[in-house]
């Protein structure tokens, strides 16, 4: 039972790190990537639909995204959604595709993005620590119900702590890499 608690904690921590990585993919780092538009939703016949479900997004150049909608009638809505999304890019529409030219980041914008990366990093670390707390609570219940001994409890909580430390180290490494990418001119 205790091994199962630790295994579940590991899986949850892995998911938290993956979610953090996905979150960072939406942070613009001066280069074009389709992940920038992941959170942009378009009002498509009354339903908020992610833009990547309504169009093909390609990266023909390092600083350009091309959005080719499957349905040309939503091109204006897509343009509005991109403008409203606070990505800091202005779409240009030629009737059949939308082009997004990603401007080089200003020093100020780089610092803002670095702060955002730190914020996401902190949220991910808190999520991992909450998982640790839940796992430790679960292990304490097992000890209270005499399913494991006090020594086993100590051993298992140490194992959970090692898991936590390794996942936080992963988050720190990912954060450092993304900050470097954001601050790169």
UniProtKB/Swiss-Prot annotation:
Q: What is this protein called?
A: Ribosome-recycling factor
Q: Per UniProt, which keywords does this protein have? A: Cytoplasm, Protein biosynthesis
Give the similarity note: Belongs to the RRF family.
Subcellular localization is given as: Cytoplasm
Pfam families, A to Z: RRF
Q: Quote the cellular component terms of the Gene Ontology held in the record.
A: cytoplasm
**Which species is this record about?**
Geobacillus thermodenitrificans (strain NG80-2)
Might you name a Gene Ontology BP term for this protein? Answer: translational termination
